[in-house]
């Protein structure tokens, strides 16, 4: 069966993730790929490209990353080729999660790749990493992702409400990180992050939230997340971090959660 495909060539830079995401969304719209499959593919490609840029070495940065998107029937796929050091995410052994809530989690990207895709295959060919990821995408659909934005309000001197819009990924997480740092430096110790308009979160975004929660713990404050969309909540479940955060169904409940006495941190 013949299908549709497009080829994308990018330099090994994190800034290119935005262009890839735009191509995936455009291809998805043209091919009527269901929105959940487009979202999952963009999370996975964010993780793959970020890993190549950060850990692929000089050989990866000296050559383009080649991506082929395709849809054949219900199969939505991406093949990624890079010249970085060999790395097989299929064979990589992920250690068990650490029970210490203050330690930064690792291997989130590999977890997302394995969990979100129905097929993950790797081979090394002519000094090139070739990674194929594919997802069954039955049916038709469209996806509209709002542009990234952060809106902040201050209920009181020590609290802030941060509403996120769009995607929290490799190219946008630094904006949230700097905004949260600025709030904490100004004396804020309680932060609500509203995820109602957040379409997806990659591992870089999870780490910003985790480190913020850890910092607020140290200050005797609290981070509360509210209104997560089902796809975002699923990513928290996959990451194993669902129990590391306080969740609320809406802003009012989040404000009430901030007023509850804090449990003492384990010694």
Report residues per predicted region:
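Helix-loop-beta hinge of the Bergerat
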Residues: 3-35, 180
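STAS-typified acidic loop motif
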Residues: 7-19, 147-178, 195-199
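Conserved short strand/loop->alpha-helix "switch" segment adjacent to the catalytic nucleotide/phosphoryl-transfer site
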Residues: 22-46, 101-105
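Amphipathic alpha-helical interaction surfaces in cytosolic regulatory modules
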Residues: 49, 83, 167-245
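A charged, well-structured terminal subsegment
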Residues: 247-267
